[in-house]
């Protein structure tokens, strides 16, 4: 009995250690991002990890502590590169990447995408209140805010003729940040449309439309997708030296590139 309790306590301790979040770099710019000054990085890969073949693995940055060490262990102990998509587009998306791709002479796909909400969604500027100081959207999720939620917000705002009190502002902004709501009219907020999410992530318009894919599934697939401009940055060496740039981007979590 004592041995079983001791074993359960040890297993619980291990789980608690693994559940501890990892410490992420700030700013989260990896080995360099467009328009951000950074030193020249050099890294030494383990001999077994030197390509070709080349590998690339992406996962959420805020994974439990044990996850990244486990992934690294199975991929030749290569350390992850952490990048936030807010340096590439108007939405934040903290991701980690374990890869053995070349990091020298990387370049972004041009033209650079819009980097602020106003640039990406210019029609929202007319209705954007001064007390909503967001310039970036939060991470794209697999679901969106409901019509009931936006209706509750509208009613809360319509109780006030001018600027609402701080308590109402806080309530509205908390929901805006949680669900990536944008202003589409006086006191009217709405979730992003699927084609707007596609644009923010770097996909062509209607990339997820049709073919039996429902609106809900479009949001889900985009929420689980990657940011194309970051993906292109990592592959830019090969796009420049080996392959021509293509509009077709293969959506994979892991791929091996033999060249």
Spans of features found by a protein language model:
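Conserved active-site and SAM-binding loop architecture
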Residues: 1-259
């Amino acid at each position: 009995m004592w041995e079983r309790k001791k074993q359960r306590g040890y297993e619980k301790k291990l789980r608690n250690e693994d559940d501890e979040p990892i410490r992420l770099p700030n700013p989260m710019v990896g080995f360099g991002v467009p328009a951000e000054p950074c030193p020249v990085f050099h890294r030494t890969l383990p001999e077994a990890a030197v390509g070709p073949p080349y590998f690339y693995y992406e996962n959420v940055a805020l994974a439990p502590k044990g996850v990244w060490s486990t992934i690294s262990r199975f991929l030749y102990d290569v350390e992850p590169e952490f990048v936030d998509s807010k340096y590439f587009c108007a939405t934040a998306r903290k991701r980690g990447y374990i890869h053995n791709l070349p990091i020298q002479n990387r370049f972004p796909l041009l033209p650079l995408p819009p980097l602020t909400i106003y640039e990406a969604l210019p029609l929202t500027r007319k209705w954007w209140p001064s007390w909503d100081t967001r310039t970036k959207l939060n991470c794209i999720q697999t679901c969106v805010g409901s019509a009931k939620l936006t209706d509750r917000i509208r009613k809360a705002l319509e109780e006030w003729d001018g600027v609402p009190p701080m308590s109402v502002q806080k309530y509205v902004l908390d929901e805006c940040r949680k669900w990536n709501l944008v202003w589409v009219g006086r006191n009217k907020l709405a979730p992003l449309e699927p084609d707007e999410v596609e644009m923010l992530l770097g996909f062509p318009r209607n990339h997820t439309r049709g073919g039996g894919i429902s609106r809900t599934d479009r949001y889900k697939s985009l929420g689980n997708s990657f940011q194309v401009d970051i993906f292109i940055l990592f592959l830019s060496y090969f796009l420049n030296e080996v392959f021509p740039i293509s509009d077709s981007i293969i959506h994979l979590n892991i791929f091996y590139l033999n060249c």
